[in-house]
Amino acid sequence: MGQVPSRRFSLFDRRSWPEARRIAEILRREAIGGGLLLAATVLALGWANSPWSESYQSMLSYQLGPSWAHLDLTLAQWAADGLLAIFFFVAGLELKREFIAGDLRDPRRAAVPVLAACGGVAVPAVLYALVNVGGDASAGWAIPTATDIAFALAVLAVIGRHLPSGLRTFLLTLAVVDDLLAIVIIAVVYTRHLSILPLLGALVPLALFTLLVQRRVRSWWLLLPLAAATWTLVHASGVHATVAGVLLGFAVPVLRGTRAGGPEAGPGLAEHFEHRWRPLSAGVAVPIFAFFSAGVTVDGLSGLSAALSDRAALGVVLGLVVGKPLGIMAATFLVARFTRATLDDGLTWTDVLGLAVLAGIGFTVSLLIGELAFGSGSARDDHVKIAVLTGSLLAALLAAVVLRLRNRVYRRLQEAETADRDHDGIPDVYQDLHRSSPRPWG
């Protein structure tokens, strides 16, 4: 008797219809946020390179806040430490949901985006380190490891509107894991000093916040003061204050408890909070941070050349444009090789390359890590900002070229994905999903 052939599974398998709709809504909001992020960046660069650049710098250094709480911060610091805490709160909500009820709850499904994200962090970091061997810029190794999903989706909205849902889901999940790795790096690597008492004190409001949300309390007059107290104490401890946002996000339950009717009674509080806070994060917090962080004086082509001649800047550009796609491609290929996974019909490795290059758009978190590594406003931080902008622009242009070449194929695949012959509001491919999809990794 002949051997039964091994079952293969898809690298980018299609999810359920409700999950596909949820992801589509997230992508739509992030794409809008990406447009606002781009506008804020252009405005900051224009102002910083105008005859009125001194007023921009004065605004950045304007201080406000209570000195008794050590919160007399500049506007730029409030944007980085305060507003980005909202971004990381939403990231925490999304991470927990993915681990409890999303793609990352199944190790077999999670393997592709998790390993791809790890490759996309490790290779740029190694490449940066090699460029800066023996130099004084080794602290910036983590700068080119981040992916800015909002910017990436803004690019997709222009050149890849017909991208198949499996590829979109892969990009989003990869970015979620990327955020988790960035959070760990910021907390572990870029904590300069640690004060134990404030850190222990932060556990009290965090525990009260957790207790309330576990009981499905939504009253913001109760939750916001506890969140603010947690943020203040984490900030005072020396750990970057954005970590408080992640911890608060992790505290929110994903599934309803039995007292609230169980998971069958509807979405948990995490989805409710994510729906409320994502527009504020993508549409307000991140663009304002970009406005305060991206405004660097370039001084023409000579200034651009001088900035990019800095080995730190060169390492960032190479990490984003070369290291990021190389790491993602290598990890994804190895997963496919060792698990005998296949690409969906109509897809090729060129499509994976397009997404891997797109993931080289590292902006928000890259700028934040640059400030933590070299100090906000320092000459090297300015060089890094120019490098992040240059590398992200190059990655966007290269991804646009690759994905544009495949747009006709994507249009055909999207037509097949959206076909609804029985007119019941659910595309046929999602109704057939449970009958046609093999179990992954047997």
UniProtKB/Swiss-Prot annotation:
Chief location bin: membrane
Q: Which GO terms describe its biological process?
A: regulation of pH
Hey, what's the signal peptide range on this chain?
none
Q: Which GO terms describe its cellular component?
A: plasma membrane
Q: Where is this region: Disordered?
A: 423-442
Keywords (alphabetical) are: Antiport, Cell membrane, Ion transport, Membrane, Sodium, Sodium transport, Transmembrane, Transmembrane helix, Transport
Instruction: Tell me which InterPro entries the record gives.
Output: Na/H_antiporter_dom_sf, NhaA
Task: Tell me the function of this protein.
Answer: Na(+)/H(+) antiporter that extrudes sodium in exchange for external protons.
Which family is this sequence assigned to? Belongs to the NhaA Na(+)/H(+) (TC 2.A.33) antiporter family.
* Identification of the protein by name: Na(+)/H(+) antiporter NhaA
